[in-house]
Amino acid sequence: MYAVIKSGGKQYRVQEGQTLKLEKLEVATGETLELDQVLLVADDDDVKVGAPLVEGAKVTAEVVSHGRGEKVKIIKFRRRKHQMRRQGHRQWFTEVKITGISA
């Protein structure tokens, strides 16, 4: 069984027992989280597609940790001017483990 959820403006295909990194959520480590923006639920041949959400469906997850991702380096050049600007960014994330899918 798998589901497609929406979190932080992105869509994720999740299965029970899977861990994934979501955009930062204000939830403490070890707490249980309910994701109710479920776009699709599939169980073998039974597929439920929402318009836009599947009613009554939710995905439960446990918060494993919070952290920051890899550094993204931004470099801007101005040609022939001997000018360069460097900048870096590390995005915060919340790592969750999917504990259940209900439809």
UniProtKB/Swiss-Prot annotation:
Name of the molecule in the record: Large ribosomal subunit protein bL21
Keywords noted in UniProt: Ribonucleoprotein, Ribosomal protein, RNA-binding, rRNA-binding
Matches recorded under HAMAP family: Ribosomal_bL21
Xref: PROSITE patterns: RIBOSOMAL_L21 (PS01169)
Molecular function (Gene Ontology), one example: rRNA binding
Source organism of the structure: Chromohalobacter salexigens (strain ATCC BAA-138 / DSM 3043 / CIP 106854 / NCIMB 13768 / 1H11)
Family named by the database record: Belongs to the bacterial ribosomal protein bL21 family.
Subunit structure: Part of the 50S ribosomal subunit. Contacts protein L20.
